[in-house]
């Protein structure tokens, strides 16, 4: 199938290569994996930008035909709970922007996942002029309502 377009998928903590069942790795990781590989089967080229949480993998890993996972340095190259990642989002956004510029790839759309990636997508839209689509996966107000004091999401 011929190439239909390029998608920059922003997924700051849900790396599709993560070991499922480990801390902060579950349904959203599966979603990112399935959507990115599904888009590739339809002829799109997808780059999944995720925060480097280990020094081990190379910067770019081929996930499947037409799908690359791009590890962006933002904070230490170690696991950080997603609720503590906000402080690293400006560096993550700048790393995504710099990587896109260095690779000279033209994307047709940004697809962001989770609220922090949504912020990154808004910033990239302003800098690169790209449209974006977003999925929250969870809404803080609903989580707080259901989980009460057990919810560890940042207040806001």
Where are these regions (language model features)?
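Catalytic cores of nucleotide-sugar-dependent glycosyltransferases that transfer UDP/GDP/TDP-activated
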Residues: 1-156
């Amino acid at each position: 199938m011929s190439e239909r377009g390029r998608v920059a998928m922003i997924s700051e903590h849900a790396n599709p290569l993560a070991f499922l069942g480990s801390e902060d790795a579950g349904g959203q990781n599966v979603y990112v994996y399935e959507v990115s590989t599904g888009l590739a089967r339809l002829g799109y080229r997808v780059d999944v930008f995720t925060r480097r949480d280990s020094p081990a993998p190379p910067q770019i890993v081929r996930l499947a035909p037409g799908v690359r996972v791009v590890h962006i340095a933002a904070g230490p190259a170690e696991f950080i709970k997603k609720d503590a990642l906000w402080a690293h989002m400006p560096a993550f956004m700048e790393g995504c922007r710099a990587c896109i510029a260095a690779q000279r790839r033209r994307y047709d759309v940004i697809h962001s996942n989770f609220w922090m990636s949504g912020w990154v997508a808004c910033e990239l839209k302003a800098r690169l002029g790209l449209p974006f689509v977003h999925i929250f996966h969870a809404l803080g107000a609903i989580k707080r309502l259901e989980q009460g004091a057990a919810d560890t999401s940042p207040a806001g």
